[in-house]
From Swiss-Prot:
UniProt organism field: Azorhizobium caulinodans (strain ATCC 43989 / DSM 5975 / JCM 20966 / LMG 6465 / NBRC 14845 / NCIMB 13405 / ORS 571)
Family to which this protein belongs: Belongs to the class-I aminoacyl-tRNA synthetase family.
A cellular-component GO term for this protein: cytosol
Protein name, entry field: Cysteine--tRNA ligase
Cofactor binding remark: Binds 1 zinc ion per subunit.
Keyword check for ATP-binding: yes
Subunit structure: Monomer.
Catalytic reaction(s) noted: tRNA(Cys) + L-cysteine + ATP = L-cysteinyl-tRNA(Cys) + AMP + diphosphate
Protein encoded by which gene: cysS
Origin superkingdom: Bacteria
Sequence motif 'HIGH' region, location on chain: 31-41
GO molecular function: ATP binding; cysteine-tRNA ligase activity; zinc ion binding
Length: 462
């Protein structure tokens, strides 16, 4: 199959050709670890996990290196640690553990490397020294700044007019800047802030600017030029634009990454997510009501480059879909080895710029094929293997049911008692009471199923 990816840099969908097929290199901007990750943070994690899985299938697990950084030096971190009266290290360790657990619950593989910014200060200092030596950066009042006019191609990624870039850069036009667009590579630390020995002969301790961190970590773990750089569309400018400027000028190279991929924004019930609107929701909060696999499928139901409208209806539909798919596979194991046509069909669809909605539509078709009364267990195993490529159906039906029950607050004994009351009401022909009990349970996401043998079973749909 041919992998085609949309490249933000070229504004086109092109065939992917790795620089080195023996080592495909992927870098994705990771979290700033100061608080629980929200559902918008989950989108790039899930999207690029699917890409990681697809690359591993195409080139081999030992021939792909996925790096996702951890930003553990930031003004938000400093403020939150002070607010909670704990050390910065305690805060970042705690928050990273939350993030790691949340993404595992979403079915995401761990990246090969998760570098921390604070462990790469030397690389940042080395890059800054290079940029100053080559005339692309300068020292001013204990700051080091990148001089944007020194790079004629600046703005090629975002393609914004200069005045729009200046408004969107969210930088102070300090009097010591040579140009209003110049951005900080290094800044002085005040008392109580983390600090390190400064580069370029600056006497006072300082700390890195945001953009230099990713340039340094990608260089350290992937080299001067690598294959794919990913992140949310909100990072195109200024973050990724500035990364390109720093890295290209430091190494005098034609590119930093061959392909730049960006996932779209997330809305909640049609509105921008914000605490002021009362619709701000963390991954952890959602995991108290839904299994992570449900959230994953709901996220993948929209193409990654399109805005996604996160709704309870969409989550409910994903839950019902997984209920059906797990009924189809039962407790079979996925088919291993090569030659699975179902998996190849899903890979082909994902190969078209990670077209996950198309892949999910085809999984519905494959589920119908595997559900047919004449379907063999081999078809069910193939169907499960195909879904595995998207990080889905990694459990058996028995495990799924148990996890589904554990994800929400239900009392099986209380449900059994209500079912007994309903059966008694039906036997007494008190259908109004029987219907009321069914509706009461349905409002909690519990669906009753009257079986041919006279028994009643139930399942969660949320």
């Amino acid at each position: 199959m041919e992998l085609r990816l949309y490249n933000t840099l070229t504004r086109s969908k092109d065939a992917f050709r790795p620089l080195d097929p023996n080592l495909v290199r992927l870098y994705v901007c990771g979290p700033t670890v100061y608080d629980h990750a929200h559902i918008g943070n989950a989108r790039p994690v899930i999207v690029f996990d699917v890409l990681f899985r697809l690359l591993r299938r195409l080139y081999g697990a030992d021939h792909v290196r996925y790096v996702r950084n951890i930003t553990d030096v930031d003004d938000k971190i400093n403020a939150r640690a002070a607010e909670r009266s704990i050390s910065i290290r305690e805060l970042t360790e705690e928050t990273y553990a939350w993030f790691r657990d949340d993404t595992a619950a979403l079915g995401c593989l761990r990246p090969d490397v998760e570098p921390r910014a604070t462990e790469h200060i030397l690389e940042m200092q080395a890059l800054i020294e290079r940029l100053v030596a080559s005339g692309h950066a300068y020292v001013a009042e204990e700051h080091v700044l990148f001089h944007v006019p020194s790079m004629p191609e600046y703005g090629k990624l975002s393609r914004r007019p200069l005045d729009e870039m200046l408004n969107g850069a969210r930088v102070d036009v300090a009097p010591f800047k040579r140009d209003p667009m110049d951005f900080v590579l290094w800044k002085p630390s005040t008392e109580g802030q983390p600090g390190w020995p400064s580069p370029c002969g600056i006497a006072t301790p300082g700390r890195p600017g945001w953009h230099i961190e990713c340039s340094a970590m990608s260089w350290r773990h992937l080299g001067e030029t690598f294959d794919i750089h990913g992140g949310g569309i909100d990072l195109v400018f200024p973050h990724h634009e500035n990364e390109i400027a720093q890295s290209r000028c430091a190494f005098d190279s034609g590119s930093m990454a061959q392909v730049w991929m960006h996932n779209g924004f997330l809305l909640v019930e049609g509105e921008k997510m914000s605490k002021s609107l009362g619709n701000f929701v963390t991954i952890r909060e959602l995991l108290t009501d839904w299994p992570g696999e449900v959230l994953r499928l709901a996220m993948l139901s929209t193409h990654y480059r399109q805005p996604i409208n996160w709704t309870r209806q969409g989550i409910g539909f994903a839950a019902k879909t997984l209920d059906k798919w797990y009924r189809v596979i039962g407790d079979v194991e996925a088919e291993t080895g090569e030659g699975n046509p179902f998996e190849s069909e899903i890979a082909d669809r994902l190969g078209d710029d990670l077209n996950s909605p198309s892949a999910i539509t085809h999984l519905h078709h494959l589920a119908d094929v595997a559900e047919h009364e004449d379907a063999s267990s081999a078809l069910k195993r193939r169907f499960k293997s195909a879904a595995n490529l998207m990080g889905l159906l990694h459990e058996t039906e028995t495990e799924w049911r148990a996890r589904q029950r554990a994800a929400v607050s239900v009392d099986p004994d209380a449900i059994a008692a209500l079912i007994a009351d309903r059966n008694a009401a039906r036997k007494a022909r008190d259908f109004a009471t029987a219907d009321h009990i069914r509706e009461q349970l349905a409002s909690q996401g519990i669906v009753l199923m009257d079986n041919k043998d006279g028994t009643t079973s139930w399942e969660l749909t949320r």
